[in-house]
Curated annotation (Swiss-Prot):
The keyword Transmembrane helix applies. This is Probable G-protein coupled receptor 63. GO terms for molecular function: G protein-coupled receptor activity. It is a multi-pass membrane protein. It comes from Homo sapiens (Human).
Length: 419
């Protein structure tokens, strides 16, 4: 079949469109005079084997294949932008102030510098840095619907994000293992010095894992299809291996270890509760005349000690549950986006990314609220630091406050605290 092609006159200018064609076509072509100039052939990237005013000629089109990339963002409607921005502002405000108060309490008050509280302060410090170095830029990206801070800071922000995330997970893992050793193995090995050493090791390890993102290895897509640089679809085996590695370190391995620890703790608490309830009260009464009241103190002391340990375990369990709810969706999303081209290039990927990132950031805001709710020392210290004009919450009268040291009742080490 013979086609007739009519070419319009040549107009100078630039074009950002790349046409990818792989064809061998036979055309009946009559070129206008403007196209017969020899200087125009490099611009057209056409190689003409034969050309004649009339008759059959051969046209070979050679070009380089360039994959088409969909638009970076799908524009968010105004109500959704306002909603997401308001949520982000609330999370940013609570995360920064709440975790700052936790850090200041541990730093300023010597009584708060127990091993567990030092670990919680490190977790709060990581959450506070996440609020300062990541959340504001994600908020600006939501308002502008595009990343405006350049390629270098996009990579650096991705490094900060995973650095603080891995550090927070490491602290939660250390606390869970410590609870397991205390309750199940009855080994109380953690002290403030060892806690500081573990914190230093965890920060160094987290930095080593996250640093390759800052130097472009793996090379993230910029601009990203999310409010910040995230993992995207790729066929690079090294890129895919890094995503799997960071997912294992930041979620799956800690999840399995913490879950195993909590199952062991639950089993131990169940056996101890049965032993306490089955303690023969008659034996205590029969021995009272010989041993005084010491025999009567044992079941009471065991009950109080188990109540302390159970409350401490419950607090860590709540932190673990919040971690799972906030991070499981984002971890799954990162893996699917890396290996599924269809998922990564779908039209609402930006909106999905935003909601899942906001859920991750929500964990940083919930942690200080959990400390305030569950840990009495943090609750009291927070009220003491608060100016009198801002103390709206009702407080117990002074004569009803506990006046004895918790260690006197709970029989804990001096470096322990009520968690």
């Amino acid at each position: 079949m013979v086609f007739s092609a009519v070419l319009t006159a040549f107009h100078t200018g630039t074009s950002n469109t790349t046409f990818v064609v792989y064809e061998n076509t036979y055309m009946n072509i009559t070129l206008p005079p403007p196209f017969q100039h020899p200087d125009l052939s490099p611009l057209l990237r056409y190689s003409f084997e034969t050309m004649a005013p009339t008759g059959l000629s051969s046209l070979t089109v050679n070009s380089t294949a360039v994959p088409t990339t969909p638009a970076a963002f799908k524009s968010l409607n105004l109500p959704l932008q306002i909603t997401l921005s308001a949520i982000m502002i609330f999370i940013l405000f609570v995360s920064f102030l709440g975790n700052l108060v936790v850090c200041l309490m541990v730093y300023q008050k010597a009584a708060m510098r127990s091993a567990i509280n030092i670990l919680l302060a490190s977790l709060a410090f990581a959450d506070m840095l996440l609020a300062v170095l990541n959340m504001p830029f994600a908020l600006v990206t939501i308002l502008t619907t595009r990343w405006i801070f350049g390629k270098f800071f996009c990579r650096v922000s991705a490094m900060f994000f995973w650095l603080f995330v891995i550090e927070g997970v490491a602290i939660l893992l250390i606390i869970s293992i410590d609870r397991f050793l205390i309750i199940v193995q009855r080994q109380d090995k953690l002290n403030p010095y060892r806690a500081k050493v573990l914190i230093a090791v965890s920060w160094a390890t987290s930095f080593c894992v996250a640093f390759p993102l800052a130097v472009g290895n793996p090379d993230l897509q910029i601009p990203s299809r999310a409010p910040q640089c995230v993992f995207g679809y790729t066929t690079n085996p090294g890129y895919q291996a890094y995503v799997i590695l960071i997912s294992l370190i930041s979620f799956f391995i800690p999840f399995l270890v913490i879950l195993y620890s909590f199952m062991g703790i639950l089993n131990t608490l169940r056996h101890n509760a049965l032993r306490i309830h089955s303690y023969p009260e008659g034996i205590c009464l029969s021995q009272a005349s010989k041993l005084g009241l010491m025999s009567l103190q044992r079941p009471f002391q065991m009950s109080i000690d188990m109540g302390f340990k159970t409350r401490a375990f419950t607090t860590i369990l709540i932190l673990f549950a919040v971690f799972i709810v906030c991070w499981a969706p984002f971890t799954t999303y990162s893996l699917v986006a890396t290996f599924s081209k269809h998922f990564y290039y779908q039209h609402n990927f930006f909106e999905i990314s935003t909601w899942l990132l906001w859920l991750c950031y929500l964990k940083s805001a919930l942690n200080p609220l959990i400390y305030y709710w569950r840990i009495k020392k943090f609750h009291d210290a927070c009220l003491d630091m608060m100016p009198k004009s801002f103390k709206f919450l009702p407080q117990l009268p002074g004569h009803t406050k506990r006046r004895i040291r918790p260690s006197a009742v709970y029989v804990c080490g001096e470096h322990r605290t009520v968690v």
